[in-house]
Amino acid sequence: MFDFELDRAVAWINDGGFSSVALQLPEGLKVRAAEVSDFLHSSTGAEIIVVGYPCYGACDLFDYKGVADALIHYGHSPIPSMGDDPNVMYVESRSDATVDPSVMDSLASLPQRVGLLATVQYLGLIPSVKGMLEKSGRTALVGKGDRRICHPGQVLGCNCTAAESISDEVDAFLFIGEGDFHPLAAAFGMQKPVLVLNPVTGEVRSMAETRDRILRRRFAAIQRASAANSFLVIQCSKAGQNRSAEADLMVRKLREHGKTAYKVILEEITPMSLMAYRVDAFVNTACPRIAMDDSARYDRPMLTIPEAEIVLGERTWDGYVFDQIRSDR
């Protein structure tokens, strides 16, 4: 179960004197939206407005102004580099799952030096897993990410700097969490094995096959885009995905290499939103996972920034890197 911290939310609404509050949840938690809304309204008297738009992370924070007095954002931690708004409350929805020591039998293949990673919901399990690994004679390290990362060991779909910070000191990474989205960021970004420990099922698996399958698709997209003459550079208007400087630089690079280049600004990047543009290929400067994970949905090559640089000859195929959204500020 995930902790919705309803008592803390009630106290925050009452202390702030908010008469209306927007409620933003990721897709996996929206099944609880009615229950949470009912509880908060009955406990505070505030009008609760559920945000129905898809929510992909704290990078996709809803602009509540003009709709409500405040916002409660569920399922993600703050992105420190985006600044602080006292009228926004983050509820990380931590899991109460535990890891049984018997899981160590499935981790026998781990090398001596291991880096630990997790999504925000399972960060609380890092100390216990670290203790189990150290008891087995291994060294377990937890890295610290850049200013997009709120907690040590945390991985976002667009940022694996917590892994990067300890990469030279470990031989493999163990990710604690569910699904492929977050561990793939580490698998793409690090040239080292990444294993996933699912704390709900106890399953342990490698990301190598999934990573390699997606990378083969990426190289195919790069090859297809090599024949393109016209490109649409996509800039996203979401606050946490808006890389305007990178988009402008990419337009200039394409034109310097004799390509026709245009820039479009979109809130939501979908096949439908790009269908009308008569270009040969797209360069995405928003969340890199749009290109990497969803490329099969688009009828033309969709590239990340480093992939476009390979097409232009500014980067070699051997120099392929994961397009992280970073922040050192």
What residue ranges belong to the model's regions?
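Peripheral docking tails and interdomain loops at the edges
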Residues: R94, V200-D212, P288-R329
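Extended, charge-rich low-complexity interaction segments
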Residues: A70-L71, G75-D85, I166-L184, A225-G240, ...
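The feature marks the mature, well-folded catalytic cores of soluble enzymes
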Residues: D3-D7, I13-M207, D212, R216-R217
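Cofactor-cradling patches in redox/metallo enzymes
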Residues: L25-V36, S128, A239-A247, V251, ...
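Redox- and metal-dependent alpha/beta enzyme cores, enriched for Fe-S-associated oxidoreductases
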Residues: F181-T260, E268-A276
